[in-house]
A protein has these predicted regions:
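N-terminal small-domain helix-loop-helix segment of the aminotransferase-like
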Residues: 3, 83-177, 184, 358, ...
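Conserved PLP-dependent catalytic core of the aminotransferase class-I/II
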Residues: 354, 366-392
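AMP-binding (ANL) adenylation modules
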Residues: 433-437
Length: 483
């Protein structure tokens, strides 16, 4: 018997004896680790086993409680209609467990949200950093105050122009990463208790930001092939007083979906009809595999309602945390919000990136990076097809560095995550990508780490673990459901 199974049995005995009556809160993960001398992964796995059996149930942000009776674990559909009342967001503790795994150097970081440092121009960025530090004076440090270093904003404006868009320098606000740009945008557009429309699934950091802002969400499904369900969005806009939408329309994280140009035009027109702003997360736009970049929704904006948020963290310098917002009519308010929060993004980082964009061969680097990522995606998809169960599906994206994997519907991705972690591999389980913990048989994998032999071995291990989890799930819940 495995350690987590023994721990689960011990808790069942406590429940049977009445030490933990129905409705009682069971020990927190941290308390259980101390009491039984086990790791957080062991406790999580024991608790999820008990949850699957209906012995305990989770309450968001409160912990686990002994059930009054058996509960059924929902199997969420990636295209489930969103016609439900707005709800508060409570980010699972599992998100933070996933984030911890990517910091462990011995772990294969397929659950990471970042590219491998081996793919980035670290030495060339370092040269730019050294150059600007030699020439900078203390008085120039104030040049980075909101709206940000003008030379950097000019370079960003130039890149918009190269993409066929005219974005004035005065509408660009530099932030400490794109997440801050989007969070500040949501903050200035809403008040606690307001309704915001988000994607399902969506990036877990968006959920964390929305939880901090105490907003209620309506989730709109994103199909890996078709993109966003605009019919569902239209119903939500008619039914609720929506203050903003927060969408990623190109190379969506985690599904890889891209909304077509006609879809983006329809999205912008629909929101303009209701005078609802769009916070557009476009951090992967530079990582397109085709000959031309994808047009963002901002391209079709004629009313200044789209706040277009970008970043250099995903494709150039993650540690510098430099992002921006092309904020349209909201630029002055966003600049003021930046003043009142973190004040300024790092001035040396702003200057270094501006220097690199002007002198460092950014386009040559991106051309090489795109080619490498396209090859690595092909390698990962090939490995998944060879090693995973036959009814596994994985998305092929036209950019970015994620694939969204649909496992057999009787596989629990949280159990799979814990098993993978035990084998030294980090993955991102589906439940962290939605407000209600759905997508229990989905995982996100990162193909942004080079090394075909290491990648192949890791995917082979995951495939074997998936087969084991399939058999385990079958033993726990009975025969697999027919397809």
């Amino acid at each position: 018997m495995k350690r987590y199974e023994r721990l689960a049995d011990q808790l069942i005995e406590l429940i049977k004896r009445g030490d933990l009556p129905p409705g009682a809160r069971i020990p927190s993960v941290r308390t259980a680790c101390r009491a039984w001398g086990v790791s957080p992964a062991t406790v999580f796995r024991a608790y999820y086993l008990l949850e699957n059996r209906g012995v305990i149930r989770a309450r968001p942000r409160s912990g686990y409680f002994v059930s009054q009776g058996p509960i059924e674990v929902p199997q969420a559909s990636p295209t489930a209609p969103p016609d439900v009342d707005p709800k508060a967001v409570n980010v699972s503790d599992l998100v933070f467990e996933v984030l911890k795994t990517i910091r462990q150097p011995e772990t294969v970081p397929l659950g990471s949200a970042f590219l491998s440092p081996a793919l980035l121009p670290i030495a060339r960025i370092g040269k730019s950093c050294a150059t600007v530090n030699r020439t900078a004076c203390l008085a120039s440090m104030v040049d980075g105050l909101p709206p940000g270093y003008e030379a950097l904003r000019r370079q960003i404006s130039l890149r918009y122009l190269m993409a066929g868009m005219t974005i004035p320098v005065d509408e660009i606000v530099i932030t400490s990463g794109a997440l801050e740009a989007m969070t500040l945008s949501a903050q200035l557009l809403t008040a606690p208790g307001d309704v915001i429309v988000i994607e399902k699934p969506t990036f877990y950091a968006a959920l964390q930001a929305i939880e901090r802002l105490r907003l209620n969400v309506v989730e709109i499904s994103v199909d890996p092939v078709k993109g966003h369900d605009l019919d569902a969005l239209a119903r939500a806009l008619q039914q609720y007083e929506v203050r903003a939408c927060w969408f990623m329309t190109s190379f969506h994280n985690p599904t890889g979906a891209t909304l077509s140009d006609s879809g983006k035009q329809a999205l912008v027109d629909l929101l303009a009809k209701h005078d609802v702003p769009l916070i557009e997360d476009d951090v992967y736009s530079e990582l397109h595999f085709g000959p031309h970049p994808m047009r963002p929704a901002k391209f079709f904006d004629r009313n200044g309602l789209v706040i277009h948020c970008g970043s250099f963290s995903k494709c150039l310098a993650p540690g510098y945390r430099i992002g921006w917002a092309a904020a349209g009519r909201f630029a002055n308010r966003l600049e003021r919000a930046k003043w009142m929060t973190t004040l300024s993004a790092s001035m040396p980082a702003q200057r270094a990136i501006a220097d690199y964009l002007e002198h460092g061969g950014y386009e040559r680097f991106l051309h090489k990076l795109r080619r490498e990522l396209a090859q690595q995606q092909s390698q990962m998809l090939d490995a998944i097809s060879r090693y995973f169960p036959a009814d596994t599906m994985a998305t092929k994206s036209s950019g970015g560095y994620f694939t969204w994997v649909t496992l057999p519907d009787y596989v629990d991705s949280i159990q799979f995550f814990l098993a993978a972690l035990g084998s030294g591999i980090s993955i991102a389980p589906g439940p962290i990508f939605s407000a209600d913990g759905g997508f229990r048989n989905h995982v996100r994998l990162n193909f942004g780490y080079p090394g075909s032999a290491r990648l192949d071995k890791a995917v082979a291990t995951l495939g074997a673990l998936c087969a084991d989890e399939t058999r385990c799930s079958t033993r726990l819940s009975g025969p697999a459901r027919p397809h």
